[in-house]
A protein has these predicted regions:
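Hydrophobic alpha-helical transmembrane segments
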Residues: 51-56, 115, 312-332
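Hydrophobic, glycine- and aromatic-enriched re-entrant/interface helices and adjoining loop segments
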Residues: 96-100, 195-318, 342
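Small-residue-rich helix-loop
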Residues: 275, 331-338
């Protein structure tokens, strides 16, 4: 099958161009971010990222020309293998889950593969499920398929990545035509947990929820179920808070008030905001960022790589990067909408949700609008597993676009 095929190839080529642009930006920024590092090993990170780019492009080409039917047939097998690999990390870590398997110079981060596995298994199940969108059993199966890997990743502990599964879950269910009241059931317990930090705010939220349920009239059973779940969510908040790791609690508290620990947990957010703000409209210039070169920004090649972009290339540089991401998301939605094969459509939507969620969270961290969760910026942040998975997702979207007429 030729890569260029009339008008259908234009979207694929544009998606490829956006991905390549972001990856090159990542390599350039990683080089700048670590150029002043006293470690020669860190200075060469950009060279390793170039090697990962070659591997990622190879994976992209393979995925583009691989029959989508193959992913559909082996969806459950891939999911089972990934779950076993996640469980195996607990034995590897001696009771405490590690986050990757080491193969010489290469570390395999299983949670990255788990994102794809969840997308495939949800797409497979929803494509062949004959139950109505509002079926309780169908809803329960989908929750189980997402909850298993999500809880295993959360146990590592990796809160940021576990939230990606939630984004996939909500987006794919919405695309499957889940009625509004059911979406309310998914989202409202999270709001209830947040609101329960202050008793008065939780009472107001719960009353508003009851009024909304009365207005929507989803049925007695659903209304009672939603009310009970939200009631329990509010009650168990102290238990959930106590189960969080100390650094996770501090990240949340510092997100609300960075000045609480300016030299500790709040240091990252404060320095990141200084870097982005000091970049102005046009930036300080390549390799001229003071916050970057003086290493005031921690994890500047991974979690806070957007801060380096903001400082060195300014507001317009950051906007250009965000436009590239927006193009990928919008073109992906267009592909998902026109796909005749529902499996392909679900896969594209799931992939888009991963990229969009990680961009929002990562950029939000750099701007101090989100708590620090450790999620990388797709295509840009340093890391082989993340880069390859980003390109695999892009390959799946292009694959679906090339074969959108197939059932």
């Amino acid at each position: 099958m030729p890569l260029i095929r009339g008008n259908l190839s234009k979207i694929g080529l544009l998606l490829f161009a956006c991905g390549l642009f972001l990856t090159i930006v990542g390599i350039v920024v990683i080089h700048s971010a670590l150029s002043a590092s006293p470690s020669k090993y860190e200075q060469d990170y950009y060279l390793r990222q170039m090697i990962w780019m070659m591997a990622a492009l190879a994976a992209f080409i393979v995925v583009v020309f691989m029959p989508m039917r193959l992913f559909e047939v082996f969806a459950y097998v891939v999911f089972a293998v990934v779950v076993l690999m996640l469980v195996g990390l607990f034995f590897k870590g001696g009771g405490k889950a590690a986050r990757w398997y080491s193969f010489g110079l290469f570390n395999l981060q299983v949670s990255e593969i788990a994102k794809l596995a969840v997308i495939f298994v949800l797409a497979r199940y929803l494509t062949y499920s004959r139950r109505p969108a509002n079926s309780v059993l169908r809803f329960g199966v989908v929750i189980s398929l997402v909850a298993i890997p999500m809880l295993l990743v959360l146990r590592q502990p990796d809160l940021g990545t576990s939230l990606v599964f939630l984004a996939i879950f909500i987006t794919v269910l919405f695309w499957s035509g889940l009625p509004g009241p059911y979406m309310l059931l998914i989202i409202s317990p999270v709001i209830s947990l947040i609101a329960s930090s202050h008793p008065a705010s939780w009472v107001v939220f719960f009353v508003l929820l009851l009024v909304l349920l009365q207005f929507l009239k989803p049925g007695t059973v659903f209304s009672i179920t939603t009310s009970v779940i939200n009631l329990l969510s509010g009650i168990i908040m102290p238990f959930v808070w106590n189960r969080l790791q100390d650094y996770q609690k501090m990240r949340i508290l510092v997100f609300l008030d960075p000045g609480r620990d300016p030299l500790g947990a709040g240091y990252q957010i404060i320095q990141s905001k200084i870097a982005v703000g000091s970049g102005g409209l046009w930036g300080k210039g390549y390799m001229a960022g003071t916050q970057t070169n003086l290493a005031f920004i921690p994890e500047r090649h991974t979690d806070f790589v957007f801060s380096v972009i903001g400082e060195e290339f300014g507001f317009w540089g950051g906007i250009l990067v965000l436009i590239a991401f927006a193009a990928i998301v919008l073109l992906g939605i267009r592909v998902a909408y026109k796909c005749r094969n529902m499996f392909s459509s679900y896969v594209v939507v799931g992939g888009i949700s991963v990229i969009a969620f990680q961009v929002v969270v990562n950029v939000g961290m750099a701007l101090g609008l989100m708590p620090v969760t450790g999620l990388p910026l797709p295509f840009v942040s340093y890391g082989g597993s993340s880069l390859i998975m980003s390109w695999v997702i892009l390959g799946l979207i292009v694959n679906a676009e090339l074969n959108w007429q197939e059932y």
